A protein has these predicted regions:
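DNA-contacting surface of Y-family translesion DNA polymerases
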Residues: 17, 26, 212-349, 357-362
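Gly/Gly-Pro- and Ser/Thr-rich, intrinsically disordered tail segments characteristic of DNA damage-repair
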Residues: 1-233, 239, 360, 364, ...
C-alpha cells in the first residue's frame, strides 16, 4: 500500500492557498546586454549583434532580435553563430556597465515597493500587494515601471502580472518584446489548464519526456491525473507539478539582506549642466527619498547622506558626509561639492542616498554606490 506523501495537497488546501491573493510582477528586460550596447552605440542598432567577445571561441551570452532571426540564441557556440550569420557583429561584454544599469533599474523598482527579488541583472520579482500607487493596480504599476525604464534609460522591458510567482514569470514571456501580460485571479484556472508543461519553471528536457510518456502535456492533463499516482511516479517534483497545475505557488518574493541604505536617482533623456537645473532635480527627488526612508526609519535617523552625479562620459562621482538625521539643506553643500568635479561635463544622472549603517568614523566618505 502506498504511503501517502506528507507533502500532498488536497483540493480544500488548494482552495485555501488560492484565497491568499498577492500582486506579483515579474519584470524581464528585453535582450538586456545587447540592448545596452545598441543604446550606447547607434551603429549597432540595425545589425545583428551578439555579446560574446571578439573571437569565434566561446559562447554567445545574449544577442539582439535581429540575430535571433538567424536562429542564434544564448549559450550557442560563437563559431556556430557565425556560420548561421557570417556578418554577425561580436561585441565584448561590459559587465560593469550592465551592473550599473541594473542598479538604475532597481532604483526604479524601489519607487513602488521594497519587496524585490532579483533573479539576475535583467529580471526580478516584485510584490506590489501593499503599493497604493495607481490605485493599487498591479497592471498599471507594471505599465508605469516599463514606461519609466524606457523614458529614463532608453531600454525596454516586458512584464508578467499574476497572483503567484511562477505564473507571473511565464506571463512575462508572452508579449515580448516591450509588452506585458496579465493573469487575474479569476483567469488562473483557465491559464494553467492550457499551459504547456515545459513552460513551467523547473520542467527540463528530461522531465518533459517522462511527462509526455504518461500522456501529460498541459496543465489540464495534470489536473485530471491521479494525484497519488503522480506523487508515486515523480516524488517531490510530482507534488510541485500538481500544485503548479492548479495555479498554486506559495513562494513569497524573497527580499535581499537587511537594508543598509536608501536611495533614489534619475537618469535624464537630455543632459543638464547648471546648479539650478540640478537643484531642481534634487527638490523633486527629496520627497521620494524621505518617504522611502520613513518606511524603515520613521524618525529619519541615518548615518550619512550623499549625492551621486554621473556625467555624459559615464564617469561618476559621489560625495557623502556624516549626518545623524536626514536634512534637505545639507544636499546643497553636497551637490556643490560634487559639481566641483564636473570639469565642464554635462550631467546625465543625479542620485540621493542615505546610509543606515552605524559606527562610521566621523569623516567625509567619498566613493561610488
Amino acid at each position: 500500500m502506498y504511503e501517502q506523501c506528507v507533502l500532498s495537497v488536497n483540493v480544500a488546501e488548494v482552495a485555501e492557498q488560492k484565497a491568499v491573493q498577492r500582486k506579483i510582477i515579474h519584470v524581464d528586460m528585453d535582450c538586456f546586454y545587447a540592448a545596452v550596447e545598441m543604446r550606447d552605440d547607434p551603429a549597432l542598432r540595425d545589425v545583428p549583434i551578439a555579446i560574446s567577445g571578439r573571437s569565434a571561441r566561446g559562447v554567445v551570452s545574449t544577442c539582439n532580435y535581429l540575430a535571433r532571426k538567424y536562429g542564434i540564441h544564448s549559450a550557442m557556440p560563437t563559431a556556430h553563430a557565425l556560420k548561421l550569420c557570417p556578418h554577425l557583429t561580436l561585441v565584448p561584454g561590459r559587465m560593469q556597465v550592465y551592473r550599473e544599469v541594473s542598479q538604475q533599474i532597481r532604483a526604479i523598482f524601489e519607487r513602488y515597493t521594497d519587496k524585490i527579488e532579483p533573479l539576475s541583472l535583467d529580471e526580478a520579482y516584485l510584490d506590489v500587494s501593499d503599493c497604493e500607487m495607481l490605485h493599487g493596480s498591479a497592471t498599471l504599476i507594471a505599465q508605469d515601471i516599463r514606461r519609466a525604464i524606457e523614458d529614463e534609460l532608453q531600454l525596454t522591458a516586458s512584464a508578467g502580472v499574476a497572483p503567484v510567482k511562477f505564473i507571473a514569470k511565464v506571463a512575462s514571456d508572452l508579449n515580448k518584446p516591450n509588452g506585458q501580460y496579465v493573469v487575474t485571479p479569476e483567469d488562473v484556472d483557465s491559464f494553467v489548464a492550457d499551459l504547456k508543461l515545459e513552460k513551467i519553471p523547473g520542467v527540463g528536457k528530461v522531465t518533459i519526456q517522462k511527462l509526455h510518456e504518461k500522456g501529460l502535456y498541459v496543465g489540464r492533463d495534470v489536473q485530471n491525473y491521479d494525484r497519488h499516482l503522480l506523487l508515486q511516479q515523480f516524488g517531490k517534483f510530482g507534488q510541485s507539478l500538481w500544485s503548479r497545475a492548479h495555479g498554486v505557488d506559495e513562494r513569497e518574493v524573497i527580499v535581499e539582506r537587511q537594508r543598509k541604505s536608501v536611495g533614489v536617482e534619475r537618469t535624464f533623456s537630455q543632459n543638464i549642466s547648471s546648479f539650478e537645473q540640478c537643484w531642481q532635480v534634487v527638490e523633486q527627488l527629496y520627497p521620494e527619498l524621505e518617504q522611502r526612508l520613513r518606511k524603515v526609519r520613521p524618525e529619519l535617523d541615518i548615518a550619512k547622506q550623499g549625492v551621486k552625479l554621473k556625467f555624459a562620459d559615464f564617469q561618476q562621482t559621489t560625495v557623502e558626509h556624516i549626518y545623524p538625521k536626514l536634512d534637505k539643506t545639507q544636499f546643497v553643500d553636497l551637490l556643490k561639492e560634487a559639481m566641483t568635479r564636473q570639469n565642464d561635463r554635462e550631467i546625465r544622472l543625479i542620485g540621493l542616498s542615505v546610509g543606515l549603517e552605524v559606527g562610521l568614523k566621523a569623516q567625509q566618505l567619498s566613493f561610488g554606490f
